[in-house]
Amino acid sequence: MLTETALDQVVGSPEVLRGQLEHLLGLGARDDVTVQVVPRSVPNNPVLGEGLITLDFGAAAPRIAFKGSHAPATYYDHEEGTTPMFRAMDRLRELASSPEESVVLLSEKLRGVQ
């Protein structure tokens, strides 16, 4: 899951951005990866300005979450910390474009890279 705004950020060069978009499209074509884009028009992004990683291992291990930005990441491994993080990720998933819509958006962005 990534924001549309992130897709517009040229870091390095347009060639780097083109490679990143191609890589995301390749990942989205895999059966074991889901790529979703949160459109810039979506209000109230629950993780705006920070990263969020959630890991759910089922019965094998407790759920964990990482939250971070430019400072050291915060690691959550207890239910009282992970529950809000998983709720935020669920909400983000609801707000994001479908995987199919995201492929269309990524393709449009790729065509627009100068």
Task: Describe the role of every protein-language-model region.
Residues 1-114:
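Hydrophobic protein-protein interaction segments
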